Structures are given as structure tokens and as C-alpha cells.
Amino acid sequence: MNLINMDSENRVVLNVGGIRHETYKATLKKIPATRLSRLTEALANYDPILNEYFFDRHPGVFAQVLNYYRTGKLHYPTDVCGPLFEEELEFWGLDSNQVEPCCWMTYTQHRDTQETLAVLDRLDLDTEKPSEEELARKFGFEEDYYKGTISWWQEMKPRIWSLFDEPYSSNAAKTIGVVSVFFICISILSFCLKTHPDMRVPIVRNITVKTANGSNGWFLDKTQTNAHIAFFYIECVCNAWFTFEILVRFISSPNKWEFIKSSVNIIDYIATLSFYIDLVLQRFASHLENADILEFFSIIRIMRLFKLTRHSSGLKILIQTFRASAKELTLLVFFLVLGIVIFASLVYYAERIQPNPHNDFNSIPLGLWWALVTMTTVGYGDMAPKTYIGMFVGALCALAGVLTIALPVPVIVSNFAMYYSHTQARAKLPKKRRRVLPVEQPRQPRLPGAPGGVSGCGTPGSGPHSGPMGSGGTGPRRMNNKTKDLVSPKSDMAFSFD
């Protein structure tokens, strides 16, 4: 009988979320410096009538926590979200790094998801119009917004920025976005068409004919041509729009430094400046022998296609996919270069072993071109091995190229699918959510016969009907600052439980 009493005294009952768990006190002492290892009957959550400790926490996670005390192994429940699991472990005083290796990959998936969502937030893919408070915070005049002292420029600056940088914010912004895309397409089309022979005009040169009378003449030089004058006017109109767009976006940008160092904006600067540089240098082109070299700078304007990323979320995701796959792409290039050098050297010496009057591989640098074309499975056919040993090397080169390129591709595709799926799910998620107020501590019950507003602890003003000054609830309640901020016209749903 004494053994039974001793066993019952060593047992402890834990009621977590309405589910009762029973274990030994010695089990809870296995992991010191935790919440369960310091249980005493003096705690507020101890019920002397039921002889149990009550915790209003997640019961499913606590089952794994209690098993950790019993077995010394912490496993991750698959039906619980990662942040909730971390929050519960923090409440019980446990380290999340003690999760077993078998559950570690599943447990850390939420961290990858959080990083992905953070990246998507930086990409600015939202099509929903932000609130006035969010705009004030973004443009740095939040204090003036709360004080109600917003100037005319502070009010117009977000609107101008939305018109030129957020194409889906309003109908006017969509119109400006269409105009911007139109000028980009016209500029690229003009850049391509002006190189067509039918779109070029032969150069007319004046020469001096030395005759007895001394007359001047001219002739038509068909070997050298210039683009039609219409393309010059088209480029002037397009670059005038691009210059206006850059200036307006820079003036109205919320962060000037972030705007300057943006990769898309840098491309826009270079492409626009190249037009003006070309315009200045054309004045001196007639004095240069190779004036065509100046036209090389105009190739920078083709990079304006990257400006379309502002108007397409798919292009933003694609570029972010390549950024996230930088390690895999670097590894791919490394193995390609390694294979190209190896097989170029092998095919050079393989073709020299046997007599071959039609040897195309006169040097290893020529073999580098052949190895690159073969490993990428392009195969132009301009160079090909003629000997059996060279053919064997070519077969190995093609096989190695297929394996080298095919291995990193699934990783890149997986990254794109991950970003795209998160973007689609994020688009369906409502941006404005119902705010949940923090749960207040329950008030102590009022003792029988005690005056109104005096609780069992003898504290005035804590009764169920107490007013702001401890009276019987006759005066109006005072709203604290936190509740006052929540109950505002801008919040979707907020209640006060004072």
C-alpha cells in the first residue's frame, strides 16, 4: 500500500489544451532548466482540486514534447506548421535545434518558405492598391501622416510613383504602362529594321573634278550606306520618352539610392545615354575611317527589353530563378569548361595518331570550339573527327555534354516552379487580414460580500463590472493606446474586450 502511495506521489498530471497527460516527476527532471522541470504547487496554473497543472497550449505539439522527456528524442509532427512548433518549443523552454535528423528536412521546410515569401515581397508583385498608411511608411512621412500635416508634394509623390512604376495600380497607370511598352517595342524594332539593306540609303559623296573649267561633281557610293532618316526621328521620339520617364521616376522615387542601384534602371541609364553619345559622335563620324565602330555602342539599347520586367511578374520570377540558381549555373559552367578543355586536347592528339590528310584539328584552340559545339549538342558539322579514335572521343564528348547539362536543369526548373507556385498562392491570399487582439489575462473572481470592484486579490478595479476608477461600472471605460490603434477606421475588423 505504501508503494502505491509513493508511486502516486511521484506522478504528475498535465492538462494541455484539454488533454490530460500523466507522467513521473523524475521524467520531467531529465531535462533541467525547462518549464516542466520547475513545476511546483505554488504556480498559478496548478489546480489543487483536480491535482493537475493546466496549460492552454497546443496539445499535439506537447505530445512530442513529453515524448522528448521520456525518450530523449525530439520528433517533428507533420500536422503542425513550423513556426507554431518553434513557438511551442520556446514556451516549454526547449531548443529547436534538438530535432532528430530524420525530421530535420521536413521541419526546416517552413524556413525555405519564409525566405521565398520574403523574396517575393521584395519583387513587389502585389497588384492591390496599398493603403494611405502603407504609402506614408514607404515614402518616409509617416509622422506627418499621423499628425495630419501632409504637404501637397507628399500627397502627389506616391501618386506619380504609382503611375510610372506600378502598372496595375490604376487605369491611368495601365495606360502609361502600355505607352512605355509601346515605345520599348518601337525602339527595338527600329534598331533591328535599320540594318536591313532595303531600309538603308547609299551615301552620296561630292568630289571635285579637275577640268579646264574647274567644275564640281558627285557620285553614288553603293558600298557604304546609312540608315534612313526616318529611323533617326523615331529614335529621337522614343528616347525623349525614356528620358522623361527616368527623370519622373527618379524625382518621385521613395528611395533615391535604391532607385539608382537597381539593375533594370542601370540598363535604362546606359541605353539612354548611348543614344546621346552616339548623337554627339555622329558629328565627327565623317572624319573617321571606321565610322561603323560608333554604331556598336547602339547595341546597348537592345537591353531595354529588360525593362519589360516591370510589367510582367513572370519575367521577374524568371530572373529571380536564375539568381537563386546561381550556384548550380556556376557549377554547370565549371564542368562545361573542364570538359571542353579535356576533350579538345584528346581530339587533337587522337586525330594526329593516325595518318589523316583531312585533319580539321590543327590546334587545341580549334578543338575548343568543336568541344563546345559537341557538348552542347549543337553540332554545326564544320569540324568533325575522321579517325576511329577521334570518333570515339567525339562520342564520349557528346555523352558527357548531355549528362553535364541535364543534371543541374531539374534544380533550376524546381526553383522556378517553387517561385511560380508561391506567387499564384500569394495572389489568392487576401492582403488585408482580420486583426486578432491579444488575449487578456482572466480577472480574479470577486469574493462574496466584497465591495464592487474588489476582487479576490483585494485589488480595486479588477471586478467583472468595475469601471475605470474601480467603481461599479457607472463611468465610461478608458481605451488604452494599443486598443485605440486597433479600433480605427482603417482596420478591417477589431473589437475591444475591456
From Swiss-Prot:
Gene3D superfamilies: 1.10.287.70, Potassium Channel Kv1.1, Chain A (3.30.710.10), Voltage-gated potassium channels. Chain C (1.20.120.350). It is found in: Membrane. Heterotetramer of potassium channel proteins. This is Potassium voltage-gated channel protein Shaw. It is a multi-pass membrane protein. Its main location: membrane. InterPro entries: BTB/POZ_dom, Ion_trans_dom, K_chnl_volt-dep_Kv, K_chnl_volt-dep_Kv3, SKP1/BTB/POZ_sf, T1-type_BTB, VG_K_chnl, Volt_channel_dom_sf. Pfam families: BTB_2, Ion_trans. It comes from the Eukaryota. SMART domains: BTB. It comes from Drosophila melanogaster (Fruit fly). Residues 431-498 are annotated as: Disordered. The gene is Shaw. The chain crosses the membrane at residues 175-193, 230-252, 263-284, 292-313, 329-350, 392-413.
